[in-house]
């Protein structure tokens, strides 16, 4: 899958732009804060119907404007896909595939396989379990439609149970809780098994990439931790119901699952250096790329934002060698350093386009 042309209107600081890309390497050069990341986020949004960070749709619209548009043409072998997205203040966003609007945005997930490496990924290591679950959920959802549907059903039941907990009247019967707890139990078990299987299948690829980039004297691991490891969710929800009424929310379930990121048998957030953290995250994302290909998806688009920051020259060199392999398809790389650009272009020897980004204006350098 490659993106051939994109038109952007009023998306973040990009007021207007129409760009055609190389099917291989697209290098975005410019100072920090000029709009390089915003272009990558636009491409990410077209793939996932949401931005890479936690901004609301209204925050994506350019200042003093009331709408934003993303319009792109993709090529997958001999097929052309036209994707349109319209965002308006205080209105529901519109996503269209080949001029036909989606009934559900979830139908779009997986059509444009995409992997993004971003400085914001450090949140997966440094902060709570939500970011780590989101990584796994977005990955699995790209190749497993049943997983995404089941996750939606689970979250709907979770919201209903939380509503009952916040408004628990003495007259409220246990049967009303059981309706939603049964749905959570059934869907939660499916999600648990799929996350467990994913972790087992994903780990070898992850280790392979990490040890290719880094020192083999380090050991890494990825552990899936769930309340369902020892109990059924339906039983847990029943046991915790009275306590949850006091708390006002559901304290147990697959929405509390976590993935332990381990380095030398310790949580990496406690012992990892900035370089080790960055290497860990890059290996995760490159493994995600290969995993999606293994699952039969088109070759993903790879978005690499500020890739070389906090990495020593040795690791940078190894990553460049990896990216130069024919395994990878279309790649977008942002950087402030022209030396990195020259180094990459010399070693990759692929077709490329170079763009200069300044104050939201993007122009190709011929």
Swiss-Prot record:
Keywords: ATP-binding, Cytoplasm, DNA damage, DNA repair, DNA replication, DNA-binding, Nucleotide-binding, SOS response
GO molecular function terms noted in the UniProt entry: ATP binding; single-stranded DNA binding
Name of the encoding gene: recF
Gene Ontology CC terms, in alphabetical order: cytoplasm
Lineage: Bacteria, Pseudomonadati, Bacteroidota, Bacteroidia, Bacteroidales
Keyword ATP-binding assigned: yes
HAMAP family, per database record: RecF
Gene3D superfamilies tied to this protein: P-loop containing nucleotide triphosphate hydrolases (3.40.50.300), RecF/RecN/SMC, N-terminal domain (1.20.1050.90)
Record-level GO BP terms: DNA replication; DNA synthesis involved in DNA repair; double-strand break repair; SOS response
Localization of this protein: Cytoplasm
Positions bound to ATP: 30-37
Position of the signal peptide: none
Protein name per Swiss-Prot or TrEMBL: DNA replication and repair protein RecF
Stated role: The RecF protein is involved in DNA metabolism; it is required for DNA replication and normal SOS inducibility. RecF binds preferentially to single-stranded, linear DNA. It also seems to bind ATP.
NCBIfam families, alphabetized: recf
Chief place where the protein resides: cytoplasm
Family that this chain belongs to: Belongs to the RecF family.
Highest rank taxon of the organism: Bacteria
Natural source organism: Azobacteroides pseudotrichonymphae genomovar. CFP2
A Pfam family the protein falls into: SMC_N
Keyword DNA damage (UniProt): yes
